[in-house]
Amino acid sequence: YLSELMDPPARLSVAGLQQLASLEREQAAALRSAWPQIEAERRRQVVHLLMELAEDNVDLDFAAVFFAALEDEDAAVRADAVRGLWEYEGRDLIAPLLRLLEKDEEPEVRVEAALALGRFVVLSELVSLREEHFQQVEEGLRRALEDELEVDEVRGRALEAIGASDRPWVEQAIQAAYESEAPRLKVSALHAMGRSCDGRWLPVLIEELANDDPEVRYEA
């Protein structure tokens, strides 16, 4: 099906795209090699359609395609690739996500990477992730959160992601974000309070249900 992907006039069909599911190692390698040769708009279409197919049928595993797309030169493709891996819990995804969070030039991609790393924070709390792996995730999210040169959207999403952790510094970070003058950080702090499942935040959340800002009320 690679030849059809590389041929812009060729129509993308569901049957054809399904051939990209559960690729063997050699097939995945061939895809990674051919991927940059596919025109940008076509790559955007492919990744978006694969996301839709995977949502409709959870048995379809397009991880190999999404992994290849994480390296795409197009930011929209990279962001969609991260979204497409929303159910993937393999530890081999941690390093690529951290790289995107720390080095990607586009805030949209960094936001998606931060949110995706939150999955591994939850796995750690469920004792389903080794400590060494969690430490990598924790350090990456903390760097993003504490980077005052980073945009608030990314910092806020990093806080939301780490919010499920019971590390002492996380509670302090949530409180600091809640008290900050940055609206995005306050909203993310409320989201993180919910993810923490910590009863100490309940009075704050109840109080914010009466906030004039609909986004604040929604998160509360």
Question: Residue locations for each model-derived region?
Answer:
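Structural signature of alpha-helical solenoid repeat scaffolds
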Residues: 51, 86, 118-122, 163, ...
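N-terminal alpha-helical scaffold/docking segments in eukaryotic complex subunits
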Residues: 1-56
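Extended low-complexity acidic/polar segments
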Residues: 81-89, 93, 149-182
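Amphipathic alpha-helical scaffolding segments comprising HEAT/armadillo-like alpha-solenoid repeats
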Residues: 23-36, 56-71, 90-103, 123-146, ...
